[in-house]
C-alpha cells in the first residue's frame, strides 16, 4: 500500500463510504453536527453539473486519505470568480505527509482552470496545526470574519 502514489482526483459516487467518516470527524473537530439532510444535499451537489460545489479526494490505491470541498462564486470585487476552499480534512494517520498541501494545490489548479481571481479559506484561530500548513502555502490577509445568524 505505501508504495502506491497518492493521487488527488474528483470524488466519485463509490467514495461515499470512505468520505462520510471523515466528513463526520471534520464536524466533530469543529464541534458541529449538521443535519443528515445537509450532508445528503452536499453529497448530491458534488455530482450536479449545475452546482458550483466540488469535492476532491486524496487516494492511495482505493483508499481515501482525505478530502477538500470548494465553491466557485461571483465577487463584487472582481470581474472573474473567486474560489472558496470550504473544508479540508486529512486522516490523522496520514497527516504530515503533505496530503493537505496536495489537496490545496489541486484546488488551486482548478481555480486557475476556471479563471478565478482568488483562492481563499478560513480556519479556527485555535487550529494551529492547520495554520502551519496554511502559512506555508498562502498569505494571511488580516481579515476578521463576522457572522450573523439568520
Regions found by a protein language model. Name each.
Residues 112-122:
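Conserved GNAT acetyl-CoA-binding A-motif
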Residues 20-45:
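Conserved GNAT-fold acetyl-CoA-binding loop/helix
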Residues 45-57, 84:
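A short helix-loop-beta-strand connector motif used in the catalytic cores of GNAT acetyltransferases and
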Residues 73-85, 95, 142:
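A conserved beta-turn-beta hairpin within the catalytic core of GNAT-like acetyltransferases
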Residues 101, 125-144, 148:
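Conserved active-site alpha-helix within GNAT-family acetyltransferase domains
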Residues 57, 63-72:
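Conserved beta-strand in the GNAT
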Residues 94, 98-106:
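Conserved acetyl-CoA pyrophosphate-binding loop and the N-cap/start of the following alpha-helix
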Residues 6-21:
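A short beta-loop-alpha structural element at the N-terminal edge
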Amino acid at each position: 500500500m505505501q508504495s502506491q502514489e497518492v493521487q488527488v482526483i474528483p470524488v466519485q459516487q463509490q467514495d461515499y463510504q470512505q468520505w462520510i467518516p471523515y466528513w463526520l470527524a471534520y464536524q466533530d473537530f469543529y464541534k458541529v453536527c449538521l443535519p443528515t439532510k445537509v450532508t445528503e444535499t452536499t453529497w448530491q451537489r458534488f455530482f450536479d453539473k449545475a452546482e458550483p460545489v466540488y469535492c476532491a479526494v486524496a487516494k492511495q490505491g482505493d483508499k481515501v486519505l482525505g478530502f477538500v470541498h470548494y465553491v466557485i462564486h461571483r465577487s463584487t470585487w472582481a470581474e472573474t470568480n473567486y474560489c472558496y476552499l470550504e473544508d479540508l480534512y486529512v486522516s490523522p494517520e496520514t497527516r504530515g505527509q503533505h496530503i493537505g498541501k496536495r489537496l490545496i494545490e489541486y484546488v488551486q489548479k482548478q481555480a486557475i482552470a476556471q479563471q478565478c481571481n482568488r483562492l481563499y479559506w478560513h480556519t479556527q484561530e485555535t487550529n494551529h496545526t492547520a495554520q502551519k500548513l496554511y502559512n506555508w502555502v498562502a498569505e494571511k490577509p488580516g481579515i476578521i470574519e463576522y457572522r450573523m445568524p439568520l
